[in-house]
C-alpha cells in the first residue's frame, strides 16, 4: 500500500464561508486533524484576519502563510496557507450577522475558488458555510450553484450511503411534471462518468422509484425507459427500485450510488442514517466541487462549540475523490 508521501496528493482549495459565521472555525479545526494532509494539500481562500480570529476562538495552534494569489502551497501541517485577495480591506466583520460586505467578500472568494480550479491550480474545491442573507444584501446570490435538472445535481454522502438527487428544491407537483426518460438517462450517465473520474471503475447505480413500490405511471412510462437507455450504453444501473428499500441496499453495499427522484426522498434517508459527518458534492462545474452540509450557525460563532466533523469529512472525501481513490469503505 502506498503512503501519503508516495502518492501525488491533490491541492484542494477551501473557501472559508461567510466570515461572520462558523466557517473559519470549522476550517481550522479540520486542518488541525492530520488526516486531511494524508489525503490532500489544503489551501484556504478567504480573509486571513477571519482565519486568525478562528485560531484564537478554537485554540488551534498553527502558523498562517498569507498569499495574495496562488503560490506553491506548503507541505507542512503546522502551516495554514490562506489566499486573501483583499475582499475585506478592513479585516474582520462583526460576528453572527448578515452584512453586505460579507456578501461581497463571499462572492469574490467563490469567484477566486472557481478561477483557480478552472486554471488547474486546484484539483478540487470546497465551499464553506455561506449566508444567503449576506449574498442577497450584496446582490450576489447568483454566485451560488443551484442544482438544475439535467445540468447540476446535489449528492449527499454519509458513510456507506451516497444519494444523488434528480431534482432539488421543487414541489412534488413540479417533480411529477419534470421527470422524463431523457432526464433520468442523462443523470445516470453523468453520475457514471463522475464516479469513474473519482476512481470507481465500474459504478453500480440504483434508481429509486417515484411512487410507492415503484408501481406508478411515472415509474413505468418515464423512469424505466430512462434506465434502459442508460443500460444500453453499458452502464450498470438498476431500477426503478421501491423507494422504501433502495437506500438499505446501498447501505449494505449492493450499490455505489442511489439516484433519488426528489429532495426529501433522498435527504430523509441520508439524515436518518447519519448526520454529523455528512458532506455534499455539487455536480455541475467541470471539476470536483464539494460543500459542508450545515449553515453559518450564527448563534454559536465564537463560542468554541462549532463541530468540524462535516468540514473534516468534506476535506477528506474531496482529497480521496480528486486523487481517484474512490469512496472510503465504511
From Swiss-Prot:
Is Metal-binding tagged as a keyword? yes
What Gene3D superfamilies does the annotation carry?
Answer: Isopropylmalate Dehydrogenase (3.40.718.10)
An annotated GO cellular component of this protein is: cytoplasm
EC numbers: 1.1.1.262
Q: Which cofactor does this sequence's record say it needs?
A: Zn(2+); Mg(2+); Co(2+)
Q: What class of enzyme is it?
A: oxidoreductase
Reactions listed under catalytic activity: 4-(phosphooxy)-L-threonine + NAD(+) = 3-amino-2-oxopropyl phosphate + CO2 + NADH
Which SUPFAM superfamilies has this protein been placed in? Answer: Isocitrate/Isopropylmalate dehydrogenase-like
Gene Ontology molecular function, alphabetical: 4-hydroxythreonine-4-phosphate dehydrogenase activity; metal ion binding; NAD binding
Task: Tell me the route in metabolism or biology where this protein functions.
Answer: Cofactor biosynthesis; pyridoxine 5'-phosphate biosynthesis; pyridoxine 5'-phosphate from D-erythrose 4-phosphate: step 4/5
Q: Name one Pfam family in it.
A: PdxA
What are the binding positions for a divalent metal cation in this chain? 169, 213, 263
Q: Which free-text remark accompanies the cofactor?
A: Binds 1 divalent metal cation per subunit. Can use ions such as Zn(2+), Mg(2+) or Co(2+).
The record ties this protein, via InterPro entries, to:
PdxA_fam
Q: Does the keyword RNA-binding apply?
A: no
Q: Cite the entry's keywords alphabetically.
A: Cobalt, Cytoplasm, Magnesium, Metal-binding, NAD, NADP, Oxidoreductase, Plasmid, Pyridoxine biosynthesis, Zinc
Role, per record:
Catalyzes the NAD(P)-dependent oxidation of 4-(phosphooxy)-L-threonine (HTP) into 2-amino-3-oxo-4-(phosphooxy)butyric acid which spontaneously decarboxylates to form 3-amino-2-oxopropyl phosphate (AHAP).
Misc: The active site is located at the dimer interface.
What is stated as this protein's family in its record? Belongs to the PdxA family.
What is the protein named?
Putative 4-hydroxythreonine-4-phosphate dehydrogenase
Question: Which species is this UniProt entry from?
Answer: Novosphingobium aromaticivorans (Sphingomonas aromaticivorans)
Amino acid at each position: 500500500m502506498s503512503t501519503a508521501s508516495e502518492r501525488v496528493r491533490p491541492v484542494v482549495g477551501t473557501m472559508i464561508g461567510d466570515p461572520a459565521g462558523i466557517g473559519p472555525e470549522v476550517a481550522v479545526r479540520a486542518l488541525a486533524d492530520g488526516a486531511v494532509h494524508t489525503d490532500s494539500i489544503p489551501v484556504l481562500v478567504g480573509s486571513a484576519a477571519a482565519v486568525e480570529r478562528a485560531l484564537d476562538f478554537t485554540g488551534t495552534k498553527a502558523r498562517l502563510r498569507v498569499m495574495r494569489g496562488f503560490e506553491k502551497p506548503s507541505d507542512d501541517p503546522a502551516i495554514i496557507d490562506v489566499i486573501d485577495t483583499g475582499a475585506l480591506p478592513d479585516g474582520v466583520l462583526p460576528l453572527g450577522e448578515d452584512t453586505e460586505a460579507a456578501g461581497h467578500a463571499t462572492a469574490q472568494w467563490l469567484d477566486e475558488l472557481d478561477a483557480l480550479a478552472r486554471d488547474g491550480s486546484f484539483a478540487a474545491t470546497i465551499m464553506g458555510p455561506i449566508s444567503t442573507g449576506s449574498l442577497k444584501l450584496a446582490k450576489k446570490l447568483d454566485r451560488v450553484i443551484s442544482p438544475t435538472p439535467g445540468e447540476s445535481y446535489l449528492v449527499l454522502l454519509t458513510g456507506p450511503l451516497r444519494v444523488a438527487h434528480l431534482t432539488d428544491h421543487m414541489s412534488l407537483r413540479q417533480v411529477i411534471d419534470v421527470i422524463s426518460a431523457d432526464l433520468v438517462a442523462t443523470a445516470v450517465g453523468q453520475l457514471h462518468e463522475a464516479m469513474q473520474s473519482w476512481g470507481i471503475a465500474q459504478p453500480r447505480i440504483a434508481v429509486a422509484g417515484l411512487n410507492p413500490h415503484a408501481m406508478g405511471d411515472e415509474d413505468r412510462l418515464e423512469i424505466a425507459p430512462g434506465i434502459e437507455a442508460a443500460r444500453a450504453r453499458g452502464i450498470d444501473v438498476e431500477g426503478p427500485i421501491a423507494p422504501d428499500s433502495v437506500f438499505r441496499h446501498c447501505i449494505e453495499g449492493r450499490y455505489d450510488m442511489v439516484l433519488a427522484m426528489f429532495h426529501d426522498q433522498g435527504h430523509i434517508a441520508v439524515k436518518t442514517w447519519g448526520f454529523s459527518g455528512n458532506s455534499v458534492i455539487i455536480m455541475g462545474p467541470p471539476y470536483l466541487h464539494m460543500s459542508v452540509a450545515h449553515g453559518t450557525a450564527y448563534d454559536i460563532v465564537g463560542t468554541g462549540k462549532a463541530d468540524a466533523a462535516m468540514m473534516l469529512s468534506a476535506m477528506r472525501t474531496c482529497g480521496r475523490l480528486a486523487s481517484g481513490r474512490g469512496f472510503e469503505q465504511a
